[in-house]
Amino acid sequence: MNDQEKSYQKILPELGDKTLVIPFTGDVNFSESEVVDRLIEIFGEVEIVPGISSIQVAASRAKVPLDKSKVITMHVTTPIEDKKLELQKALIDGFSVVLVPRPWPKQPDKHFMPSEIAIYLRENGFETTKMKVHVFEAITTENETNFEGTVKDLEGKEFSDLSVMVFNQASLDSYMNYRWQWEN
């Protein structure tokens, strides 16, 4: 972040009427709000141009509808204790969850990746041997991988910082279950 900040401060006085483009590797509307907020503080008006997010792609690959899911990011610098409780509640309430974990390898107390999440859920009473999960890494790239198994299987496994988890609790619920809409 220090180099990033230095770059912004160097560019600011030279920018004038020119347009500055800052590409993001993540979802600018999801896990990058702290950076966007800083850009607004420095440059004032900014235009955000969204793309297809890894969240959308992961949900699609896992066949988990976002309208029946909770989307949670742990990929923030602020404390995540409330987000951990939000994860528990969503799973207890039967929602699928699409989750961006928190890579922080230099500070193990803040590192909350799939293995740590699996242990956390088990320690909080979840039957992780019965919970289905996908972990997608480097999604939409030639290096994309997909782990599919149970949450218990994640314990001790390492995943990259380019990971998205999908806890799949979805069940089919097509419009055929709601015939009252068109039948008299």
Regions found by a protein language model. Give the residues of each.
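Short beta->alpha junction loops
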Residues: M1-Q4, T73-T77, A138
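Class I S-adenosyl-L-methionine
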Residues: M1-V49, S163-V164
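Conserved active-site and cofactor/substrate-binding residues in soluble primary-metabolism enzymes
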Residues: N2-K6, E34, S53, D82, ...
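Generic hydrophobic alpha-helical segments
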Residues: S7-L12, E86-L87, I117
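Predominant activation on well-ordered alpha-helical scaffold segments within soluble catalytic domains
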Residues: L12, V36-I40, Q56-S60, S115-R122, ...
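Short, structurally constrained coil/turn elements
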Residues: G16, I42, P65, E127-T129
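A contiguous loop/helix-start segment that scaffolds small-molecule binding in enzyme catalytic cores
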Residues: T19-L20, L91-N184
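Class I SAM-dependent methyltransferase SAM-binding "motif I" and its flanking Rossmann-like core
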Residues: G26, F30-F95, E148, G156
